């Protein structure tokens, strides 16, 4: 008849099939995976927090930039209107000077004509 089954040798209870080194118990593997996943989740949450902070900071800077752009636009409009007024003012001054110069030249011509023809 056949020989009775031999009990396993001492120290071989946790060994992997094939006689390799013993593997961790299944409970330890799932705990390690859970810890790794939690660490990854915490890392992603930290990255998201940083990104949200950056977005809020960027929004604030854009708001400030928009306010400055509005103020600059208002200043540019005011400058444009005052420059147009100044241009008109000096155009009229120039016209007056030309009229005065023409009148003076006309008077000089009249004086010369009267002096030579009388």
Curated annotation (Swiss-Prot):
Ranges in the topological domain labelled Vesicular: 117-118
UniProt effect for mutating residue 48 to M: 1000-fold increase in susceptibility to C.botulinum BoNT/D, no change in susceptibility to BoNT/B or BoNT/F
Sequence intervals crossing the membrane: 97-116
Key words, A-Z: Coiled coil, Congenital myasthenic syndrome, Cytoplasmic vesicle, Disease variant, Membrane, Mitochondrion, Mitochondrion outer membrane, Neurodegeneration, Phosphoprotein, Synapse, Synaptosome, Transmembrane, Transmembrane helix
Entries under Gene3D superfamilies matching the protein: 1.20.5.110
InterPro entries for this protein: Synaptobrevin-like, Synaptobrevin/VAMP, V_SNARE_CC
Modified-residue entries (Phosphoserine), positions: 63
PTM characteristics: (Microbial infection) Targeted and hydrolyzed by C.botulinum neurotoxin type B (BoNT/B, botB) which probably hydrolyzes the 78-Gln-|-Phe-79 bond and inhibits neurotransmitter release. (Microbial infection) Targeted and hydrolyzed by C.botulinum neurotoxin type D (BoNT/D, botD) which probably hydrolyzes the 61-Arg-|-Leu-62 bond and inhibits neurotransmitter release. BoNT/D has low catalytic activity on this protein due to its sequence. Note that humans are not known to be infected by C.botulinum type D.
Site positions for (Microbial infection) Cleavage: 60-62, 68-69, 78-79
UniProt keyword Ion transport, yes or no: no
Family: Belongs to the synaptobrevin family.
Record note on quaternary structure: Interacts with VAPA and VAPB.
The protein, known as: Vesicle-associated membrane protein 1
Organism: Homo sapiens (Human)
Recorded name of the encoding gene: VAMP1
């Amino acid at each position: 008849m056949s020989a009775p089954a031999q009990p396993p040798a001492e120290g071989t209870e946790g060994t992997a099939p094939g006689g390799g080194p013993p593997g961790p118990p299944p409970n330890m593997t799932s705990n390690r995976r859970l810890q790794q996943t939690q660490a990854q989740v915490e890392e992603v949450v930290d990255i998201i927090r940083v990104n949200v902070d950056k977005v809020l900071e960027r929004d604030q800077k854009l708001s400030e930039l928009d306010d400055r752009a509005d103020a600059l636009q208002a200043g540019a409009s005011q400058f444009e209107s005052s420059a147009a007024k100044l241009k008109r003012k000096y155009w009229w001054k120039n016209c007056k000077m030309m009229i005065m110069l023409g009148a003076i030249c006309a008077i000089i011509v009249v004086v010369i004509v009267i002096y030579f023809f009388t």
